[in-house]
Every structure is written in C-alpha cells, then in structure tokens.
Amino acid sequence: MVPTVDMGIPGASVSSRSVADRPNRKRVLLAEPRGYCAGVDRAVETVERALQKHGPPVYVRHEIVHNRHVVDTLAKAGAVFVEETEQVPEGAIVVFSAHGVAPTVHVSASERNLQVIDATCPLVTKVHNEARRFARDDYDILLIGHEGHEEVVGTAGEAPDHVQLVDGVDAVDQVTVRDEDKVVWLSQTTLSVDETMEIVGRLRRRFPKLQDPPSDDICYATQNRQVAVKAMAPECELVIVVGSRNSSNSVRLVEVALGAGARAAHLVDWADDIDSAWLDGVTTVGVTSGASVPEVLVRGVLERLAECGYDIVQPVTTANETLVFALPRELRSPR
C-alpha cells in the first residue's frame, strides 16, 4: 500500500512514492515549488498594508500582479486599478506594480503630488540598475523580452536611447549595434530559461564579444518553477498550469511542460476552466502554478481532480524557497 498524508483536500492524499514509479491508479504530480514568489508576495502585501494603513481607495497603476483572482480580491477590498498616473486624483496614494515602471512614470507621479509606494520586485529593480549602468558606459543593451510587457516597458524606459528589444529568436537577425566591443544582453525576469539561452547563443554568434549581465536576470522563482515542471512532465499525459493568460511566467510553464515531454498542457485561471475531455485516457496529471498564483486556486484544482478520481497526490520537489523581501519602507512596522 502506498503511504499517504492527509492534505486537507476532500478525496485526495499525498503519496511518498517516487516519480519514477508508475501506479496504475489515477494520480496527480504536484510541482514544488509553485505559486507565489517573494516579489509577488511582497507586492500583494504592499497593497493590503496600504489599505490597512490609509483606508480605501488606494490606487494601483496596472495590475499589481498578473492574476485575475488577486486583482479582483484587492479591488473588493478597496484598491482601484488604473492604467496611468493621470487617472489618479492629485495628492492620492498610488502603488506601482511588481513589474516596475519607467522613470517618466515617477516624474508624472511627482508632478501630480502623488504619494508613491513602489512595489517593484527587487529583482526587476536589479535589471533597471543594470540598464542604467550600461547606458552610462554607452553600451548597446539588447533586452530579451516580450514587446508590450510592463516589465520590458519599464526596463527600456531606464535607457531608451541604448536599449533594443529582442523579442524571440527570429528578432536576432534584425539587431544592429554601433560598436561590437560594447554590447551587453539583459532580459525580462519571467522568460523561458531555455529560449533565452537560445537567443543569447544566436546573439553571440553575431556579436562574439557580447557581454553577460553581472548576474542572472531571469529570477530564481521563474527558473525553479520551470525546473520542477521539467522533472514531472515526462511522467504526465497532461499538465495543468494555474495562472492567467497575461502572466508571462505562467504561459512559459505551459511551453516548458510541452517541451519536456507532456502530451498536453493547459493554462487555467481556476478549477472551473478544466475541460473534462482533457482527462480522457489520462492516468497522470501534473499540476503547477505561476509565480503570481495564490495557493487557494491550486487547492481548487486538486479538489476538482480528486472528484474525477485523481485521489493520489505526489509532490515533485526540486527546490526549497526561503527568500523573503522586505516591504517598502513606507509600510514597514517600527522596531
């Protein structure tokens, strides 16, 4: 008999059997780590603390993180989400999202006398600092990322005269530089590690003296979640990724699962998005979630799968995350 542990999910239990074993009964492989990263946790708590301290409304420029459930929950608590600072009443409180903003946004907020609380992920801030540093040294900066993504817009805004966006492998051939001795690549933090390295390889073939960033720009959580998916995907006929469609790191997890051997992979916002037809003939389902997804949504998916007979849950653990980021100074408790 397979040892199990109660998960608090009706009809489901955790099995200690290794991934390599293939039980005949239906099962779920549950990726660990998954869900909230340190930057998302900090950003969501920033809005919650701002509401507690100042009361509603607290304005938030763009979605604080790319997850519908999180945004809807905060909106019900009194957060008001806007696209630009011009929509915020003069003198009001505004929170900048985890994805970061360009310097022009800070200027606009100052001109409107807004009380800014910056929830930019510290790992995104690191990339901003790198962009400014290399721009000061007059480098051409090749920013690998997705056009229009808030994080890319913010990073490019730090050095608009020096940054060129490289959006995918096919964009490499369009890149031009002024001095092949002064070229560096930076990246959006939520990309596929494998695709990014493929792009870097092609860039380096064109520009042999291409410099790497001082440290890895793709965040630890993005990498960890992709590694966990790669570990379980070969065992899965189906992988379900919990996350919103505008979440870059969640979309990448679907791609990684398919690339690592899963027969099918789907992105769902919550359990009701699961199509029962996906489960036809499926014995093993992999489950993971993007870095902006609260665990309650994963629990809902596991409950739905348990109702469909997937009552054994086997964790697939590839890393243990302990990183915590301090809240913005304006919201820290006095010591």
Curated annotation (Swiss-Prot):
Locate the residues binding (2E)-4-hydroxy-3-methylbut-2-enyl diphosphate: H66, H99, H149, T189, S247, S248, N249, S292
The pathway entry for this protein reads as:
Isoprenoid biosynthesis; dimethylallyl diphosphate biosynthesis; dimethylallyl diphosphate from (2E)-4-hydroxy-3-methylbutenyl diphosphate: step 1/1; Isoprenoid biosynthesis; isopentenyl diphosphate biosynthesis via DXP pathway; isopentenyl diphosphate from 1-deoxy-D-xylulose 5-phosphate: step 6/6
GO BP term, example: isopentenyl diphosphate biosynthetic process, methylerythritol 4-phosphate pathway
Deletion phenotype, per the entry, is:
The lytB2 gene cannot be deleted, unless an additional copy is provided elsewhere, demonstrating that this is the essential homolog. lytB1 cannot complement for loss of function of lytB2, but the sole LytB homolog of M.smegmatis is able to compensate for loss of LytB2 in M.tuberculosis.
Q: Where does [4Fe-4S] cluster bind?
A: C37, C121, C219
What note does UniProt attach to the cofactor annotation?
Answer: Binds 1 [4Fe-4S] cluster per subunit.
InterPro entries per record: LytB/IspH
Q: Which residues form a coiled coil?
A: none
Q: Per its database record, what is this protein's job? A: Catalyzes the conversion of 1-hydroxy-2-methyl-2-(E)-butenyl 4-diphosphate (HMBPP) into a mixture of isopentenyl diphosphate (IPP) and dimethylallyl diphosphate (DMAPP). Acts in the terminal step of the DOXP/MEP pathway for isoprenoid precursor biosynthesis. Has a higher activity compared with LytB2. Is essential for M.tuberculosis growth in vitro.
This chain belongs to which protein, by name?
Answer: 4-hydroxy-3-methylbut-2-enyl diphosphate reductase 2
The organism encoding this protein is Mycobacterium tuberculosis (strain ATCC 25618 / H37Rv)
Lineage start? Bacteria, Bacillati, Actinomycetota, Actinomycetes, Mycobacteriales
Gene assigned in the entry: ispH2
